[in-house]
Amino acid sequence: EQVVGKALKPYRQDVVIATKFSNVFDEETRQITGNDVSPEYIRAACEASLRRLDTDYIDLYQLHNGGLPTDDVDAVFDTLDDLVTQGKIRAYAWSTDTVDHAAYSATRDHVIAVQHRLNVIEDAPDMINVIESNDLASINRSPLGMGLLTGKYSAGSTFDAKDIRASNQEWMAYFTDGKPSARWLDKIASIRDILTSEGRTLAQGALAWLWARSENTIPIPGIRTIEQLEENAGAMEKGALTSVQMTEIQSILSS
């Protein structure tokens, strides 16, 4: 947040800043130490984000707890409504892959988006249906499949022990025992030629698929280098895939 705030300060009126809350974070050690969605914590976390971002308001404040029961989320949303009234945030969203949660959040006046996992090898038609029917933004987490859709990794690739992809956590679907899953690599190989058409890199093709998937999609690819940033931005010059290409991809992946 400090880096983003400093970089965007001269352009604040021209950009939309989104951030998340619920993970308790130690700024000194840079470690997550817990999870808290109490009204007191939400307000404190918002103030801390405003300070780090060096801004008077947050455009989109996102609940980063996809498994929170809907019975418990109303108190969260009520607190967020108060922050909207106070001018601290403009709107809010739920980061969740659960369709019912997305539909529930859509009943709130200040919810304008859902952040969820979506990419060319892992479509989410039910989620997209909820998002489109409620005129929400679809903010796409893992648009490049945690790196698999960059083409940099093969079945024999390994990761540093500090890399989360080596952790073998249950939700790490694209990787098995710290290595790229053959299942997902095979899917990518089957559609590579379509994604890399018209001079696109594989990553650019994956972003082009998302733009063609729905008018509501907003992919948020991670970047670590200037080169990755330029590659992702370059995808905009080539635009979305065509309807014919989208149909071909769907046919291949469903066979």
What kind of region is each of these model predictions?
Residues E28-R43, L68-P69:
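Active-site mouth loops of central-metabolism enzymes
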